[in-house]
Amino acid sequence: MASNRFDVQLTREAEKDLRRLQAHTGRVTRAILKLEDDPFLGHPLTGSLKGTRALEFSLPGSGVYRTVYVVNDATHVCLVLIVGPHENIYDRAERRVKALRRAGHIP
């Protein structure tokens, strides 16, 4: 029987984002790994980020954070593009998405 679980992968930049969160790495990782069972947990984004999704989660004492990711149904992969505080995340995500699309890594 085929598994319905998705493989959650992080871009190099998203890995750097995660390392910067130091004390919260475990909490953030647990939030992101929820995508293994439900990759559509986050909400779809529009405009220049169409085709990506955003997952919101809170970190005690640090506020609201987001991760922006792409779901590939064919390969059962969730590719995390960015992780960080809500402030300016979509502007930063746009730059990363543009670069990844230009390189042919995401549609």
Q: What is each of the regions a protein language model found here?
A:
Residues R30, P44, G84-P85:
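Sparse recognition of residues in long alpha-helices and their boundaries
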Residues L33-P60:
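A short, surface-exposed loop/turn module that caps and links secondary-structure elements
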Residues V8, R53, C78:
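A broad, low-specificity signal marking well-ordered, structured residues that form hydrophobic/aromatic
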Residues R12, L49, G84-P85:
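A general secondary-structure junction signal
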Residues L21, D38, V83-H86:
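Short beta->alpha junction loops/turns
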Residues M1-I32, H105-P107:
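Arg/Lys-rich, positively charged N-terminal/basic patches that mediate binding to nucleic acids
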Residues S3-N4, F57-P107:
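Enriched for short, Lys/Arg-rich terminal
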